[in-house]
């Protein structure tokens, strides 16, 4: 049942923090309870979307079973509604709306009936050409029932590409045809009668990775068979007891079914790949790996680089100063800053991780508490100390301003803010809710004006050069991170992604305004 109550704490958070659109998960394993595995996979991806979620399964009789709902994964699903989700494969989704309203009708998976059976789809990202593609389809007489990009994708996949036999599914050709029309930004999983396809756009803008698990054979439990999973982040692979294989490559189509796994190039990968750098800064869980490196380690390097670029003021010493981070995503950067600067790291804030999605409306008194319901200072650690407060980003500055007031109220004598990313100057149009130009404080004010607004003694950001150095230094080519042949060719194929001249292979448009593809908004 959809709950339309507004949440004041969630609204407060949305005013201050960028939001990832979605998390996707898929598994093919007829021997297992795939809906239950998908459930735990989605729990691991909960941080990527908290508005709605859903699971769909395909059974041996070619029937699709689906359950969606508004709220967190463990609020929507239980033993009763998981039990009917029988099947040999499953796809799942956690959603935060950046294209389409936050309503149950826009929850995923989306199921569509085609001439070749039902298909289900889950997607992360925004189509940068959604407007023109929607218009093109409507001119052909196609109607739309929801305002999410995923319906555009399903309609394109339902249409038979020119030159293909309309009596055959040709899913690989259909997907490649869709990819030819949509450069970015998407990572999606498509469930068909013939298995699951994982698809990543040619820029690699949204993450998608591949894992495997060994399961007992149905006919002979003493033997095992390898099955496969696809997911937005590797943390979900570990959660279900699977083994990480590799990232899905830009432009790649990965097909998992009864016969195992095959791989195709759906669209030639770009010479300038553009994985969203905010995956490293904020979105991904610290225990996930991308491009062969652990997110936690990258964030710690960001903190170390930040300390070299913007060291503590000379008035601060390791006797009277502490480094604290804003829980949770900023803690690795704070640890790195402390390590490099020699100023001790201390826990200064605790976070209530369970209140931001409550639908219980607060009294006027509690509403006035604002940020205090989400964060609480450790007064004994802070009182009488100079504080270096490390956060991962400033978007609108509402949260950081409130936290500074909270920390000062706990007895801090000085507060120096250090941000482990550059100023956010431009909105994102590729799957992240990052406000508009009018709402971005970095676009409208100087660093000094922001410092004055938030009430800090000093404010300094990590440079773009420092950010990219922290990210790029640990990237491992696919050939180093995995030697498993997953391509349809007879020998293993590796694709070394080209790095352009300034060694920048990530989307940094929110910092520079240089978008990696054309937009038709």
UniProtKB/Swiss-Prot annotation:
It catalyses: 5-phospho-beta-D-ribosylamine + L-glutamate + diphosphate = 5-phospho-alpha-D-ribose 1-diphosphate + L-glutamine + H2O. Binds 1 Mg(2+) ion per subunit. It holds the Pfam family Pribosyltran. Its cofactor is Mg(2+); [4Fe-4S] cluster. Residues 1-21 form a propeptide. Keywords: 4Fe-4S, Allosteric enzyme, Glutamine amidotransferase, Glycosyltransferase, Iron, Iron-sulfur, Magnesium, Metal-binding, Purine biosynthesis, Transferase. [4Fe-4S] cluster binds at residues 276, 428, 507, 510. InterPro entries: GATase_2_dom (IPR017932), Ntn_hydrolases_N (IPR029055), PRibTrfase_dom (IPR000836), PRTase-like (IPR029057), PurF (IPR005854), PurF_N (IPR035584). Its EC number is 2.4.2.14. Residues 22-259 form the Glutamine amidotransferase type-2 domain. The active site is at residue 22. GO terms for biological process: 'de novo' IMP biosynthetic process; purine nucleobase biosynthetic process; purine nucleotide biosynthetic process. Gene3D superfamilies: 3.40.50.2020, Glutamine Phosphoribosylpyrophosphate, subunit 1, domain 1. SUPFAM superfamilies: N-terminal nucleophile aminohydrolases (Ntn hydrolases), PRTase-like. PROSITE patterns: GATASE_TYPE_2, PUR_PYR_PR_TRANSFER. Mg(2+) binds at residues 329, 391-392. It is an enzyme of class 2 (transferase). It comes from the Eukaryota. Pathway: Purine metabolism; IMP biosynthesis via de novo pathway; N(1)-(5-phospho-D-ribosyl)glycinamide from 5-phospho-alpha-D-ribose 1-diphosphate: step 1/2. In the C-terminal section; belongs to the purine/pyrimidine phosphoribosyltransferase family. This is Amidophosphoribosyltransferase. It comes from Dictyostelium discoideum. The lineage of its organism: Eukaryota, Amoebozoa, Evosea, Eumycetozoa, Dictyostelia. The gene is purF.
